[in-house]
Structure formats: structure tokens, C-alpha cells
């Protein structure tokens, strides 16, 4: 990588404070990964609203047209221990745009957390899902979780492939044959 590219990449994310990482995608583009913050609420709303209907369906296992205030309240409610989220941002037209997010939330069974990852349609297939999930898995381990799981549509091939690559084991949901439960021992 040239010094001009390095300088450009560094300056795009120069004002970021706190824990963060600049990661390379499979096509050479860079994204900023950091914990979700309250200031990201509008970005999260725009991110969800820009997703294709198919991507929204895979993420929420149902039809939603846009992010309601109640949904945003739920998604933004993280405490960095029992619930965590990492956001992927790109510098675009002078603004930071959300292009992906991974999250977990503790479950009623001790030591378990449910996870999800969502990638903007124009950033799918570039390895961003794996980057976000690796950060999420590391934090879940550090926070004492012993198992992570995800409930996904059986038709979501990308999630099935990602989970397999990360070491999750999948099985059909015994309560809903259209869904798969992927589990990872932490």
C-alpha cells in the first residue's frame, strides 16, 4: 500500500476515540470497527432503512418496512457486558456511513448469548461479516459467555456459510422448520 493510501485511510478516521480498529475488506477497502454508541442512533435507522427487503427479512425474520422508534430503542440498548454491538463505518462524502453491525444479547440461560450480524447490501461478500463476528466473539468470551447462538432463516445461505467458517454448528429449529439455530461453544 502506498503512503498516499495509508495517509488517506488514517485521515478518514483520525477523529475516532476509544476502542476501534481499521480493517481491510477482501476488495482492499477499509472500514472502521468500533462499539456502537448512542450517537449512532440515526446512522442505525438509516442503515436499516437502506437494506433491501430480502436483507431486512433475513435479519429480522419477518417483514419490516423501516426502523420504528421502538425497534431503535431495543437495538440501541447496549451495556457493553450483557449486550454488545460493533458497528462498521466507512467515510463517504464527508460523513461516516454504517455498512454493517454485529451484536449479542444475554439470554435467560446463564452463559449464553444470542447474536446477529447484518451487512449493507453493497458490502456483502467482502468478508465484513466475518470481521464483525470475530470482534463480537472475542468480547463475548472476555465477558464470560460460554455459548453464542444465532437463529436464522434456513434460506439464508450466506449466514450458514459464515457460521460454518467461524465454527458454529447448525441444526434445524425444532419449533420452526423454516429456521436454523447455529451454536458456537466459546
UniProtKB/Swiss-Prot annotation:
Coiled-coil region list: none
Q: Which UniProt keywords apply?
A: Acyltransferase, Transferase
| Binding positions (CoA) | 117-119, 125, 156, 161-163
The domain of life for this entry's organism is Bacteria
InterPro entries under this entry? Answer: Acyl_CoA_acyltransferase (IPR016181), GNAT_dom (IPR000182)
Output the PROSITE patterns linked to this UniProt entry: GNAT
Which positions fall inside the N-acetyltransferase domain? 31-186
Top-level EC class: transferase
Q: Kindly list the GO molecular function terms attached to this UniProt entry.
A: acyltransferase activity, transferring groups other than amino-acyl groups
* EC numbers for this chain: 2.3.1.-
Functionally, this protein is described as follows: Catalyzes the transfer of an acetyl group from acetyl coenzyme A (AcCoA) to an acceptor substrate and releases both CoA and the acetylated product. It prefers the antibiotic chloramphenicol.
**What's this protein's name?**
Acetyltransferase PA5475
Q: Which organism is it from?
A: Pseudomonas aeruginosa (strain ATCC 15692 / DSM 22644 / CIP 104116 / JCM 14847 / LMG 12228 / 1C / PRS 101 / PAO1)
Amino acid at each position: 500500500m502506498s503512503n498516499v493510501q495509508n495517509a488517506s485511510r488514517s485521515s478518514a478516521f483520525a477523529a475516532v476515540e476509544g476502542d476501534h480498529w481499521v480493517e481491510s475488506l477482501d476488495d482492499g477497502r477499509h472500514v472502521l470497527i468500533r462499539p456502537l454508541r448512542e450517537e449512532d442512533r440515526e446512522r442505525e435507522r438509516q442503515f436499516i432503512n437502506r437494506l433491501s427487503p430480502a436483507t431486512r427479512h433475513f435479519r429480522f425474520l419477518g417483514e419490516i418496512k423501516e426502523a420504528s422508534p421502538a425497534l431503535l430503542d431495543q437495538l440501541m440498548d447496549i451495556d457493553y457486558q450483557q449486550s454488545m454491538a460493533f458497528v462498521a463505518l466507512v467515510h463517504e462524502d464527508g460523513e461516516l456511513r454504517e455498512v454493517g453491525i454485529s451484536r449479542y444479547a444475554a439470554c435467560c440461560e446463564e452463559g449464553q448469548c444470542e447474536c446477529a450480524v447484518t451487512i449493507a447490501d453493497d458490502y456483502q461478500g467482502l468478508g465484513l461479516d466475518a470481521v464483525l463476528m470475530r470482534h463480537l466473539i472475542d468480547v463475548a468470551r472476555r465477558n464470560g459467555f460460554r455459548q453464542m447462538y444465532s437463529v436464522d432463516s434456513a434460506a439464508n445461505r450466506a449466514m450458514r456459510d459464515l457460521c460454518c467458517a467461524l465454527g458454529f454448528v447448525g441444526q434445524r429449529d425444532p419449533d420452526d422448520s423454516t429456521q436454523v439455530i447455529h451454536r458456537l461453544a466459546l
